[in-house]
């Protein structure tokens, strides 16, 4: 039996999963990762804890699977994107906590870039909107605020990386400073047309090129693990940011294929093939995971509050005592009774981009019960995702393609049958849940398998992908369109005047 090991480093935990060559889970392990909140709007991790927890889960997973390093053909890494680590090349020690993707401290630098008129040029080169979310201004902040960091960086003494780079550095004993195109494309420093760091963007943000890792395709030779760590060397063959890895794990390899990950928020990606396409509908363009040196792209949109609305029902309203209870409560009524919820607790993300929007519940009557509100909360996840898919389809059609014909789903909330059926009804296309829902880790394993010869091509991976359940639309299109019109009216009400 051939095995592949996937390291899945996330915002709240580090996980490792052992897969067999058919993509089936053999064993898995998880360790919590504490977050650090030094000030309002600031979010950090200790990079040493990222490494400690990730290594421990890899060791645990191999032990649980009752295999050794010699049984593992290759290792793949997938990771929280944009989170920024800066470390000393000689000692291997971080010079500061990692600045997490959620952190907003670089917003003043972003505002300055926008005011100086750089938005169009940055989007043209990177596919991204100027935002503190991305790594570039986080790195700029570290160089400007950590004593001695800028001088050390210019002297070539420091290394920058997203979480994948940091893990590879540690896994290889400091011999490899590399990343992949999907992670590089989230820095706001990477030219997605040339697949290279962009000198003009580096100069604009005053970042020395000596800091930057080598960029490789997502299925490549990233080095091998130090033999002392896992009981023997293991080739590192696959690396991809979490959302691009999930797209790959869902076998979305061709233009027009799309997936939605239902987590705390929702992340929807649509593959656009070898075509870089600028969105006219509020979406980002990003590099997809690349199995070869040929550039591949995707359009991406994110919903800020997805499964988090269920947590709010539990912790805020105390309508349920456990998240798993929401489906039964929502199913206790035939519909939402006219109640519409817009969970804009932190504004609205794509395709609206309304940071000043606030959460609303409309359509309340004396007959409204907590079950109606729970159903409206659950349905709000589907409404937001439907608006996102409509924006993607408009972009696809504008570029001469076809609208998305099927949505593949993963993430914690995809197990909710009521939500998935309502999603299919709103979209008017099938929603497909895979047999293996750990698609983020599976994508990393698939990439490692391609690099190490376990798989000959992505065609082989497409044949391995299996659906667990297919939700087909049951609602007439006229009804679905009327519901979406009510949703858009509710969104307009959620935007504060002035």
Swiss-Prot record:
Q: Which organism is it from?
A: Acidovorax ebreus (strain TPSY) (Diaphorobacter sp. (strain TPSY))
Swiss-Prot/TrEMBL catalytic activity: glycerol + ATP = sn-glycerol 3-phosphate + ADP + H(+)
Q: Which residues bind glycerol?
A: 81-82, 133, 242-243
Keyword Nucleotide-binding attributed: yes
InterPro entries assigned:
ATPase_NBD, Carb_kinase_FGGY, Carb_kinase_FGGY_CS, FGGY_C, FGGY_N, Glycerol_kin
Give binding positions for sn-glycerol 3-phosphate.
Answer: 11, 81-82, 133, 242
GO biological process terms, semicolon-separated:
glycerol catabolic process; glycerol metabolic process; glycerol-3-phosphate metabolic process
Residues at which ATP binds = 11-13, 264, 307, 311, 412
Q: Which domain of life is it from?
A: Bacteria
Query: Cellular component per GO?
Result: cytosol
Give the function comment from the record: Key enzyme in the regulation of glycerol uptake and metabolism. Catalyzes the phosphorylation of glycerol to yield sn-glycerol 3-phosphate.
Which SUPFAM superfamilies does the entry mention? Actin-like ATPase domain (SSF53067)
This protein's record includes keyword Signal: no
Entry protein name: Glycerol kinase
What keywords does the record list, in alphabetical order? ATP-binding, Glycerol metabolism, Kinase, Nucleotide-binding, Transferase
EC number(s) for this protein? 2.7.1.30
């Amino acid at each position: 039996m051939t095995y592949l090991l996937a390291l899945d480093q996330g915002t709240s935990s580090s996980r490792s999963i052992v897969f067999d060559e058919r993509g089936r889970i053999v064993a898995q392990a998880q360790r919590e990762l504490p977050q650090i909140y030094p000030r309002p709007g600031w979010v950090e991790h200790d990079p040493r804890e990222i490494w400690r927890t990730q290594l421990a889960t890899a060791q645990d997973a191999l032990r649980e699977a009752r295999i050794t390093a010699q049984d593992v053909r290759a290792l793949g890494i997938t990771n929280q994107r944009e989170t920024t680590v800066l470390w000393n090349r000689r000692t291997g020690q971080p010079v500061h906590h990692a600045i997490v993707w959620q952190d907003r401290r670089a917003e003043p630098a972003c505002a300055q870039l926008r005011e100086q008129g750089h938005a169009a040029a940055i989007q043209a080169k990177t596919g991204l909107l100027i935002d503190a979310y991305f790594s570039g201004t986080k790195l700029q902040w570290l160089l400007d605020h950590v004593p001695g960091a800028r001088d050390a960086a210019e002297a070539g003494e420091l290394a920058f990386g997203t979480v994948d780079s940091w893990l590879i550095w540690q896994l290889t004993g400091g011999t490899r400073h590399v990343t992949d195109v999907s992670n590089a494309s989230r820095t706001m420093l990477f030219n997605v047309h040339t697949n290279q760091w962009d000198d003009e963007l580096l100069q604009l943000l005053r970042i020395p090129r000596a800091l930057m890792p080598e960029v490789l395709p997502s299925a490549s030779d990233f080095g091998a693990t130090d033999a002392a760590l896992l009981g023997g060397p293991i080739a590192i063959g696959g690396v991809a940011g979490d959302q691009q890895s999930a797209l790959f794990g869902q076998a979305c390899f061709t233009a027009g294929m799309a997936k939605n990950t239902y987590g705390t928020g929702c992340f929807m990606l649509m593959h656009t093939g070898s075509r870089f396409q600028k969105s006219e509908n509020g979406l980002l363009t990003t590099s997809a995971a690349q199995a070869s040196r040929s550039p591949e792209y995707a359009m991406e949109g994110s919903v800020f509050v997805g499964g988090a609305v269920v947590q709010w029902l539990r912790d805020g309203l105390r309508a349920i005592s456990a998240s798993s209870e929401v489906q039964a409560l929502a199913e206790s009524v035939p519909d939402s009774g006219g109640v519409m919820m817009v969970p804009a607790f932190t504004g609205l993300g794509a395709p609206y981009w309304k940071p000043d929007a606030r959460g609303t519940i409309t359509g309340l009557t004396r007959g409204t019960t907590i079950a109606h509100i729970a159903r409206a909360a659950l349905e709000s996840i589907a409404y937001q995702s439907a608006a996102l898919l409509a924006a993607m389809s408009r972009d696809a059609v504008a570029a001469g393609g076809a609208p998305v014909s099927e949505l593949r789903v993963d993430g914690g909330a995809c197990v909710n049958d009521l939500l998935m059926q309502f999603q299919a009804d709103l979209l008017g296309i099938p929603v497909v849940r895979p047999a293996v829902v750990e698609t983020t880790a599976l994508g990393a394993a698939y990439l490692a398998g391609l690099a190490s010869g376990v798989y000959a091509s992505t065609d082989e991976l497409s044949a391995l992908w299996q659906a667990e359940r297919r939700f087909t639309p049951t609602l007439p299109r006229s009804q679905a369109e009327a519901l979406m019109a009510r949703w858009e009216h509710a969104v307009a009400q959620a935007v504060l005047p002035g």
